[in-house]
């Protein structure tokens, strides 16, 4: 099982770069197992083995710490659905800051790219959240709208 170093109830969802590596946390309450696969510090991990297993808490959050992980590393989750007949397969991190689709790993099985939370500049310093009653909330999965199929990372500007 992956280390629980730097993991707590307040660990952010998604991948977060911290000193010495990165934390990974995902909500999958019905999963029977969640594994972290990817390329970290030049080493490829592509197995559903005990040493790649994330730890599940009582609320359905799976988490682990990958030592040596850093900016630019690629990752994705392998999720085993609920037993006894659950589906299984690779899943992207819904909190990923960047995705890359390649010939060998096309969308939707593409890799997420580990990026620091401050890697994208925001130009909205004067923004103020409107009253909730004035909001229209939409959820869009950016990877669904990707126009890059040549192995180049997609980003939010691709859907603008």
What are these regions (language model features)?
Residues 27-34, 70:
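Short proline/glycine-enriched turn/loop motifs at strand-loop junctions of beta-rich domains
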């Amino acid at each position: 099982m992956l280390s629980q170093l730097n993991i707590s109830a307040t660990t952010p969802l998604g991948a977060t770069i911290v000193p010495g590596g990165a934390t990974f946390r995902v909500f999958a309450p019905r999963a029977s197992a969640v594994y972290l696969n990817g390329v970290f510090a030049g080493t490829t991990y592509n197995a559903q083995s005990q040493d790649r297993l994330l730890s599940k808490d009582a609320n359905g959050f799976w988490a682990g710490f990958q030592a040596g992980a850093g900016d630019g590393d690629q990752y994705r989750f392998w999720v085993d659905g609920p037993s006894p007949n659950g589906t299984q397969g690779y899943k992207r991190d819904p909190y990923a800051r960047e995705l890359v689709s390649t010939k060998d790993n096309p969308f939707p099985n593409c890799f997420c790219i580990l990026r620091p939370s401050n890697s994208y500049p925001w130009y909205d310093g004067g923004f103020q959240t409107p009253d909730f009653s004035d909001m229209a909330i939409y959820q869009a999965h950016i990877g669904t709208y990707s126009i890059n199929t040549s192995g180049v990372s997609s980003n939010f500007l691709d859907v603008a």
